[in-house]
Amino acid sequence: MIDSIKQKLEKLNPLNDSNKTKAAVFIGILYFDDYIESPEILFTVRSSKVSTHSGEVSFPGGKWEQADKNLCETALRESEEEINLKSSNVNNLGALNYLISRHDIEVNPFVGLITKKQDFVANDEIEKILTVPLNFLLNPSNLINQEIE
């Protein structure tokens, strides 16, 4: 399954730069033989104390800073700040095309395999850290399409 994800990411055609403020998120796939039997996706729940995205389920991430060499580094830096993710435990698989958020920010998702068990610790921006089995997310009977106005 991981090889299939990597192959699909390699085939993506990147979008042209949007010239908007940039941010990056990390889509972490936890999968290591000794601990997890099938891949799980790492999510966070944003704290009710933050001004944007309060209470939302999200991926760890944030805005690009000038000290960041690239947007992948932004995603990993923010993930370390928010949940104590060690970048040395990550095997970068690739990137998805960006989306423009409701706040008019270009959000760039990076997908990585978390290869070692580690303790995740939420900072004050994060209320909860959770994982969801990838098989659950891929099962059509678990999907609901709902239009929100």
Spans of model-derived segments:
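Acidic, negatively charged sequence signal
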Residues: 143-149
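Proline-centered turn/helix-capping motifs that create local helix->coil transitions or kinks
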Residues: 138-142
